[in-house]
Design a protein with these regions (language model features):
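Short, well-formed alpha-helical segments that are part of the catalytic scaffolds
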Residues: 16-33
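Acidic donor-binding loop at a coil-to-helix junction in glycosyltransferase catalytic cores
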Residues: 185-191
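Conserved donor NDP-sugar-binding/catalytic core segment of glycosyltransferases
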Residues: 111-141
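Acidic donor-binding/catalytic loop of UDP-sugar-dependent glycosyltransferases
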Residues: 52, 95-97, 102-118
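Short beta-strand/loop segment that forms part of the nucleotide-sugar
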Residues: 36-48, 68-71
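Short, flexible, basic/aromatic active-site loop/helix in glycosyltransferases
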Residues: 140-160, 232-233
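A conserved acidic beta->alpha catalytic loop
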Residues: 43-55, 106
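Conserved donor nucleotide-binding strand/loop of the catalytic core
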Residues: 55-93
């Protein structure tokens, strides 16, 4: 009998006390949508936070996951730490553990884990989804249109984007590819390239979509917030 998949959700969080609760509630809703035979775990990495991020996370996850403290100040290192803790907590086979990655300023849909599970069950080793922006209030009025025009999605529903905020990978493939590296930015593209080079079966689909914050100032240098901010300015 095939061992059911275990879903481990990993979320790095740095000074995210304002948005973290929204993220955790959405993740919990997604966990509740999983089939009863599928186990899940939630690991939040409070990375070099100076606000109440750790406490917000701890108050939420008690009994439903764990919170890890990190002083790395590096998103790649924080993600890697979260995965290590996830794999310490799951004793089953690595090829039956799915690592679902998102960010603390995101809101995932109720079917987010279900949808990744469906790809895992059909033999995929990794999934790359897209992001949409929750609000452009911090930006000039035309930024929304500029972003949506530039954010390419192919007619068949595939896309060229890679976001750590919406990346799933089977644990054995993750380990074979070398895992998250200690990168301050573009750690997601780096891992995805190594998964591709390793010939792991992967898919990039727009049907996997999470909402992310539209803030101008993000946590990672040259991250998504910087991409959005660059759309401001003279037309």
């Amino acid at each position: 009998m095939t061992t059911p998949f275990h879903m481990a959700i990993v979320i790095p969080a740095r000074d995210e006390q304002e948005l973290l609760s929204r993220c955790l509630r959405s993740v919990q809703n997604a966990r509740l949508m999983l089939p009863s035979h599928v186990t899940s775990d939630l690991i939040v990495v409070a990375d070099q936070s100076t606000d109440d991020t750790y406490q917000v996370a701890w108050d939420f996850v008690q009994g439903n996951g764990t919170v890890v403290e990190s002083q790395a100040g590096c998103v790649g290192a924080a993600r890697a730490l979260g995965v290590r803790r996830a794999l310490e907590r799951y004793r089953g086979p690595r090829n039956r553990c799915w690592l679902a990655n998102t960010d603390a300023d995101c809101h995932v849909p109720a079917t987010w884990l279900q949808d990744q599970l469906a790809f895992a069950n059909t033999g995929y080793s990794a999934t790359a989804g897209i992001v949409d922006v929750d609000s452009f209030a911090e930006h000039e009025p035309f930024v929304s249109d500029r972003f949506r025009l530039a954010y390419l999605i192919h007619a068949d529903g595939t896309h060229p984007h890679v976001h750590g905020a919406n990346l799933g990978v089977r644990a054995d493939a993750y380990l074979q590819a070398g895992g998250w590296q200690n990168l301050y930015t573009a750690e997601d593209h780096d891992l995805w390239r190594r998964l591709q080079r390793g010939r792991h079966k992967h898919i990039s689909v727009a049907s996997l979509c999470v909402l992310t914050s539209g803030r101008k100032a993000g946590r990672a240098p040259l991250g998504f917030a910087g991409t959005l901010a660059a759309y401001n300015g003279a037309a």
